[in-house]
Amino acid sequence: MRRVTLTQFLIEQQRAGRVSADLRLLIEVVARAVKAISVNVSKGALAGVLGEAGTDNVQGEAQKKLDVIANEILLQANEWGGHLAAMASEEVETVHQIPFDYPKGGYLLLFDPLDGSSNIDVNISVGTIFSVLRFPEGEAEPTEQSFMQPGREQVAAGYAVYGPSTQLVLTVGHGVHAFTLDREMGSFIYTHPFMTIPDDTHEFAINASNARFWEEPVQRYVGELQAGKTGPRGKDFNMRWVASMVADVHRILTRGGIFMYPLDEKCRAQGGKLRLMYEANPMAMLVEQAGGAATTGRERILDLMPTKLHQRVPVILGSRNEVERVTAYHRES
């Protein structure tokens, strides 16, 4: 059986008119950066990359050494290619401009360089999330405003999960496809075509330690799940929580489920916990392309108009029937 590489897959997408040559090359550069990050993650303590870096990011969170390393790898890999007008990183406060001595292109790249980095020191799966937008026509120079586009305008989105194997999960608007890194070949191999999320599920992911802070619709929904066969749902559910969005969403894309980081009293002043541009939008695009749904509990995530680069929102995504049920509970409240 012929093994198809990521490059071959993207060339076929280009021939079918689904991606431009520049977008294809941009995704390949991101994939090369992912390989480099994967090497650093897998070495761990052997390379002295565990622990905190001694600095805080724009979110006020203590950075891990690998946060800083992954961020630099992505910035440096993508600066020179000529495909980008600018970049934005969850770890950096302002827009990252392309140096003057490099050519500029027609796309904007956003990324969370190392999602779930609090898990690094305990050897649990982490990941990289990315999103691609078009640079608005008619603008001379990219600014923060250039990035203020709803998630439905994304032309590509994806993530890498660094687990027992490294996988790159990608959509360019025509289904969700996963590629597994063959370390001997040095290539991503097409292993999971057209990933789909079932409409129904028996698994849910939420940080139950925050239960006392949840709004009533979420308390009602989770309470019904916990009641199991003897409750209103008439079946048992299992709870899963990795505290790494990439790992939790990857499980949902693989076998279904619902992921929730809802609005609660702890994060109400911030608008939510997760970042719209770096986490919610790309994951929402992937989930919808796989047949699932993604909302804040009140609105479709991909319809939200961002107002700032590091905006936070509630996130509820996964199996369509469950997401619609939670959203209905919010409407009723």
UniProtKB/Swiss-Prot annotation:
* Annotated localization: Cytoplasm
Annotated residues for binding of Mg(2+) 1: 90, 112, 114
Q: Which GO terms describe its cellular component?
A: cytosol
The positions annotated for binding Mg(2+) 2 are 112, 115, 279
Q: Which GO terms describe its molecular function?
A: fructose 1,6-bisphosphate 1-phosphatase activity; magnesium ion binding
Top EC class for this record: hydrolase
**UniProt-annotated binding residues for substrate:** 115-118, 207, 273
Cofactor(s) it depends on: Mg(2+)
Alphabetized InterPro entries for the sequence: FBPase_C_dom (IPR044015), FBPase_class-1 (IPR000146), FBPase_N (IPR033391), FBPtase (IPR028343)
What's the EC number here?
3.1.3.11
| Cofactor info, note text | Binds 2 magnesium ions per subunit.
Highest taxon listed in the record's lineage: Bacteria
Mind listing the UniProt keywords for this protein, alphabetically? Carbohydrate metabolism, Cytoplasm, Hydrolase, Magnesium, Metal-binding
Q: In which pathway does it act?
A: Carbohydrate biosynthesis; gluconeogenesis
Name the chemical reaction catalysed here: beta-D-fructose 1,6-bisphosphate + H2O = beta-D-fructose 6-phosphate + phosphate
Signal peptide positions are none
Offer one example of a GO biological process linked to this entry. Answer: fructose metabolic process
Q: Which family does it belong to?
A: Belongs to the FBPase class 1 family.
Its subunit composition reads:
Homotetramer.
Q: This protein is called what?
A: Fructose-1,6-bisphosphatase class 1
